[in-house]
């Protein structure tokens, strides 16, 4: 079976849905989010605020998730290009 030659938002959504997520707040105003990908590889990101009094956990997690999605695009884009370069993609 051949792979397609491009990624779409739906592909990244499907990958993200399969990730296990852990969220930490190691210090006031700091958020760390890690995703364990379907293949077992782990990626992580962190965000922080200037004043811990104005810290909003959901904003911190949201920023990290956006950055992690960007990482998915890069990682899976690279993997697809590798397959495409070998002639395995459509």
Residue ranges: model-predicted function:
Residues 1-90:
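Domain-level marker for long, solvent-exposed, non-transmembrane regions
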């Amino acid at each position: 079976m051949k792979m397609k030659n491009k990624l779409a938002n739906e592909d990244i959504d499907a990958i993200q849905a399969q990730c296990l997520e852990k969220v930490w707040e190691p210090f006031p105003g700091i958020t760390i989010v890690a995703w364990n990908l379907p293949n077992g590889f782990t990626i992580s990101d962190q965000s922080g605020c200037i004043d811990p009094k104005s810290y909003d956990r959901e904003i911190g997690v949201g920023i990290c998730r956006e950055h992690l999605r960007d990482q998915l695009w890069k990682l899976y884009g690279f993997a697809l290009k590798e397959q495409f370069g070998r002639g395995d993609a459509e």
